[in-house]
């Protein structure tokens, strides 16, 4: 299994990466979204550029999976969770970044911090992602990426991928 081999080599749980692939493309390698995301893992061209991968190579399943793993690693290292953060909170916040971009999630985390709440709690971050559609939140000095109207889709994405990951964990060993 290509997803398993690449994910294990890159230090990620192949079952999570498979859950992402299922949600993103239903394992269809030659799909392109309306927004320009490509392949099994629905990678944006800007991500390919970050990792010096030519746009023409993005549809290659192995390259696409490798890019998704690299993106997950970059998100994880950028977020710098403290030691006490639960695995579920960590995974949910990382998946939200994968789906909506790290900027909106970081805005939600900054809003949580400014309001005295836990920026490492998915429940809190999810609430602030939703609130970023309202001017009193997206006009805050803590917000760098402006208004966010995609929270419903992002929250559904996180729930769906984690639900599928949980199923994969029940039926397949790591």
Where on the chain are the PLM-derived regions?
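A short, acidic/glycine-rich surface segment
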Residues: 28-31, 82
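Short glycine-/small-residue-rich flexible loop motifs, especially phosphate/cofactor-binding loops
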Residues: 4, 18, 45
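N-terminal export signals and maturation junctions of secreted/periplasmic proteins
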Residues: 1-8, 29-30
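Non-catalytic cell-wall polysaccharide-engagement segments
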Residues: 2, 10, 49-63, 67-70, ...
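Soluble periplasmic/extracytoplasmic beta-strand elements of cell-envelope proteins
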Residues: 19, 42, 94-97
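Extracytoplasmic
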Residues: 12-17, 22, 35-38, 90, ...
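Short, surface-exposed glycine/acidic/tryptophan-bearing loops
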Residues: 31-50, 114, 122
């Amino acid at each position: 299994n290509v997803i398993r081999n690449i994910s294990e080599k890159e230090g990620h749980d192949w079952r999570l990466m498979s859950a992402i692939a299922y949600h993103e493309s239903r394992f269809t390698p030659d799909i392109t979204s309306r927004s320009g995301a490509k392949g099994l893992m629905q990678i944006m061209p800007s991500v390919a550029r970050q990792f010096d991968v030519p746009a023409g190579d993005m549809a290659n399943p192995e390259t696409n999976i490798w890019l998704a793993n690299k993106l997950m690693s970059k998100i994880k290292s950028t977020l710098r969770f403290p030691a006490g953060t639960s695995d579920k909170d960590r995974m949910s916040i990382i998946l939200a970044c994968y789906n909506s971009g790290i900027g909106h999630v970081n805005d939600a985390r900054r809003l949580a911090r400014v309001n005295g709440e836990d920026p490492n709690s998915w429940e809190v971050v999810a609430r602030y992602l939703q609130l970023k559609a309202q001017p009193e939140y997206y006009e805050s000095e803590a917000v760098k990426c402006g208004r966010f109207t995609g929270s419903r889709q992002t929250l559904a994405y996180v729930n769906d991928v984690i639900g599928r990951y949980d199923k994969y964990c029940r039926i397949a060993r790591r």
